[in-house]
């Protein structure tokens, strides 16, 4: 009988402690800011912009890491015929960002982005500014993407025919594609990519 009483008391104590624990957890969760409880994008534009800005930051990092006297660097020792030099890669990505989001807005995109377009930027500071301007523009336009216009048709020679949502995704992919290429340009010049340095990765990027 004593054993049963002790067991019953232990069970009651356990239930009481569990209730107290749950109450404490509930109080802690309700005291947290709303952003910490549900820190996810609240719109279609936000769902893409975080990844776009991350890709842009990575690309800008490699563009800034390469010394200006290496902006004319072209890989050798393999099948690199007719590839762009480092500076041309940066200019191409900047031009493409303007092109994609010009098409998003129904505007005429710049011509010849394959070669960097007609923007006169040539020096490293000029190309970095051109790149930053293109990123600022793309984020400004992306902010207008909504559930109502996401599937609107977009025409254009760069990413059309497509939808506004689709062309936004293409813009993210395009930056990451060229980021991967420029990582090799940096490493061929003995430079560790900034993102690798930041996270101290031992292999890969």
Locate each region found by the language model.
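N-terminal targeting signals for Sec/Tat export/insertion, comprising classic cleavable signal peptides
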Residues: 33-73
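Solvent-exposed, charged/polar functional surfaces in cytosolic regulatory/catalytic domains
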Residues: 54, 58-61, 65, 137-144, ...
């Amino acid at each position: 009988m004593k054993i049963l009483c002790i067991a019953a008391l232990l069970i009651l104590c356990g239930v009481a402690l569990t209730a107290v624990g749950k109450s404490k957890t509930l109080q802690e969760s309700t005291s947290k800011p709303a952003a910490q409880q549900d820190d996810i994008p609240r719109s279609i534009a936000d769902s893409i912009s975080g990844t776009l800005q991350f890709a842009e930051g990575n690309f800008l990092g490699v563009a800034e890491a390469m010394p200006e006297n290496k902006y004319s660097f072209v890989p050798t020792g393999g099948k690199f015929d007719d590839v762009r030099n480092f500076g041309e890669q940066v200019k191409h990505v900047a031009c493409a960002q303007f092109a994609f989001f010009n098409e998003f807005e129904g505007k005429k995109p710049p011509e010849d982005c394959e070669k960097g377009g007609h923007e006169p930027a040539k020096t490293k500071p000029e190309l970095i500014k051109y790149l930053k301007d293109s990123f600022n523009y793309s984020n400004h336009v992306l902010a207008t993407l909504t559930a109502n216009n996401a599937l609107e048709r977009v025409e254009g020679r760069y990413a059309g025919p497509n939808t506004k949502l689709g062309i936004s995704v293409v813009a993210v992919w395009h930056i990451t594609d060229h980021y991967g290429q420029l990582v090799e340009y940096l490493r061929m010049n003995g430079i560790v990519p900034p993102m690798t340095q930041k996270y101290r990765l031992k292999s890969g990027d």
